[in-house]
Regions:
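Conserved beta-strand/loop scaffold segments within soluble protein domains that form the structured core
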Residues: 23-28, 33-285, 289-292, 302-307
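C-terminal functional modules
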Residues: 1-25, 30
Length: 307
């Protein structure tokens, strides 16, 4: 049964209001709350003894969505989930994931998940994963997502990962392997506050000729929170890779950004950029002259930066 709290979480992490259109799997407190397959997208449980689902998308599937959100509303729930995606050839699909935790108790609630994508020739996947935590209990809210992607010739993925607010601890691991003419674009947006801690390890291997990879990371660290970023692009052939990390630091927060590029071919073209700084005083002043308070001006700037 979907409660009012559950519905609020689903809207925040997956923009869902009511029953989703198309294929979907809603996981709640380590169980399957609802599931639906379509003619072109099949969702099945993992074999016995392994938690998670298997999503198979038929060749030529275009314009369809698949929603697979996870919500935890009971304090003390911890889980390890494995989701495998098999995308056929010549597809163009949207996959919306995400996890929301409401913890009003004193025990830790944690979701660890491994998503593995096998994207076939000339297929395009848009993948969105949002994380959000709330609740007035003392129990922590923890998420540790691992995403692994294999892109065949001409395949591509646009991946957007967002941590909205309220996650006490997270370790994100992402690895993408690109074949010939494949393309990976990863946009990461992260907000931490209080004493939260976030780590993100990301690696894109450009193995095939004319493979392309881009990482765009934008983060805000407030209060006494800590962030560590380690994006890596490895060029093993004629390829192009670009890493861009921009962070705003506030209060007594700490940010460590360690972008790395490795070229194992003379035809690899790789670029990395990293910047950490505070909000510029002239930006705040300009907004305050328009009638905003300092707090409202800060909030407006941060929303624009993370948009």
């Amino acid at each position: 049964m979907i409660t009012e709290i559950d519905a609020s979480l689903l809207e925040k992490i997956a923009d869902l209001t009511g029953k989703p259109v198309g294929a979907f799997n809603i996981r709640k407190d380590s169980g399957c709350e609802a599931r639906q397959s379509t003619e072109h997208i099949a969702i099945d449980p993992q074999p016995e003894g392994k938690s998670g689902i298997i999503i198979r998308i038929k060749d030529g599937t275009k314009g369809e969505q698949c929603h697979i959100p996870v919500i935890i509303s009971k304090s003390g729930v911890t889980e390890m989930v494995y989701n495998d995606f098999y995308v056929g050839e010549n597809c163009d699909v949207d996959i919306v994931a995400g996890c929301g935790i409401h913890n009003s108790g004193c025990n830790e609630s944690r979701h660890d998940g491994v998503h593995t994508f096998y994207v076939s020739k000339n297929s395009h996947v848009r993948y969105v994963e949002k994380h959000y935590g709330e609740g007035d209990g003392e129990g922590s809210r923890v998420m540790n997502p691992t995403t692994i992607v294999y892109l065949d010739e001409g395949a591509s993925i646009q991946m957007e990962t967002v941590q909205i607010r309220g996650i006490d601890s997270t370790v994100r691991k992402t690895k993408i392997v690109c074949g010939k003419d494949a393309e990976a674009v990863v946009t990461e947006r992260l907000l931490t506050h209080g004493k939260q801690h976030a780590e993100s390890d990301m690696e894109i291997e450009l193995n095939g000729e004319d493979a392309r990879g881009r990482v765009i990371s934008r983060s805000v660290a407030q209060d006494e929170s800590q962030q560590v970023f380690h994006p890596v692009v490895v060029g093993n052939s004629r390829c192009f890779g670009h890493v861009q990390c921009d962070s705003i630091i506030m209060g007594k927060a700490k940010i460590e950004s360690i972008p790395a590029i490795t070229a194992n071919s003379t035809d690899a073209q790789l670029i990395h950029e990293a910047a950490i700084g505070k909000i510029a005083g002239d930006q705040l002043l300009k907004l305050q002259t328009l009638g905003l308070t300092e707090e409202e001006a800060e909030d407006t700037i941060l929303k624009g930066f993370l948009a």
